[in-house]
Amino acid sequence: MRESIVERRTSETDIVLKIGLDRTEPHQITISTGIPFFDHMVQAMSRHGGFDLNITAKGDLEVDSHHTIEDIGIVLGTALQQALGDGRGIKRFGYAIIPMDEALAEAVLDCGGRGYLVFKGTFGNSTVGGIDTSLFEHFFYSLCIHAGITAHIRFSGQNDHHTAEAIFKAFGIALGQAVTIIPESNQIPSTKGTL
């Protein structure tokens, strides 16, 4: 089983995260960050990506949600990197284009060990669900850098809830594809022989 448990404790946050990349039925998803809209987004990402995810996070929400969301990205990225190991047998690449009513999001991923993020699109408002919309890019940046994932995310929409949800679902589906094991493959998906 490709699983990882990562804990992060700082003066700003206390996070325990467990991820399982190999599909189980029913999915084991429990997200508790103290930020209900963010919980909803991460749950959608996990469910549509087909991986188990349990997050318990306590952060300095009396300040704002920045530290909590950033640190969850760091911990999730670290857990993904650990669960993938050397990447032997994975598809490595994944993509998804997901609509949600008027919103459309595209996510293209390479789990090749090089952390990078391109995040293109604009939200109509500065906040959605009580979250500063700039934190979505920051979350995915933190995740990608610590997981060693290159991600290109593009989006458009008029309703920011729909737009955010389409982004998280697209990322989850693309990630689920990229980490899928190719049957009977024991190869590291790189011409270099390493990710």
UniProtKB/Swiss-Prot annotation:
EC?
4.2.1.19
Record keywords, A-Z: Amino-acid biosynthesis, Cytoplasm, Histidine biosynthesis, Lyase
Where is this protein chiefly located?
Answer: cytoplasm
Name the domain of life this protein comes from: Archaea
Q: Does the keyword Protein biosynthesis apply?
A: no
Q: State the SUPFAM superfamilies in the record.
A: Ribosomal protein S5 domain 2-like
Per the record, its GO cellular-component terms are:
cytoplasm
The enzyme class is: lyase
InterPro entries tied to this protein = IGPD_sf, ImidazoleglycerolP_deHydtase, ImidazoleglycerP_deHydtase_CS, Ribosomal_Su5_D2-typ_SF
Q: In which pathway does it act?
A: Amino-acid biosynthesis; L-histidine biosynthesis; L-histidine from 5-phospho-alpha-D-ribose 1-diphosphate: step 6/9
Q: List the GO biological process terms.
A: L-histidine biosynthetic process
* Swiss-Prot/TrEMBL catalytic activity: D-erythro-1-(imidazol-4-yl)glycerol 3-phosphate = 3-(imidazol-4-yl)-2-oxopropyl phosphate + H2O
Q: Cite the GO molecular-function annotations of the record.
A: imidazoleglycerol-phosphate dehydratase activity
Q: Where in the cell is it found?
A: Cytoplasm
* Family statement: Belongs to the imidazoleglycerol-phosphate dehydratase family.
Q: Which NCBIfam families does this UniProt record tie to the protein?
A: PRK00951.2-1, PRK00951.2-4
HAMAP family according to UniProt: HisB
Task: From the Swiss-Prot or TrEMBL record, give the protein name.
Answer: Imidazoleglycerol-phosphate dehydratase
Q: Which gene encodes it?
A: hisB
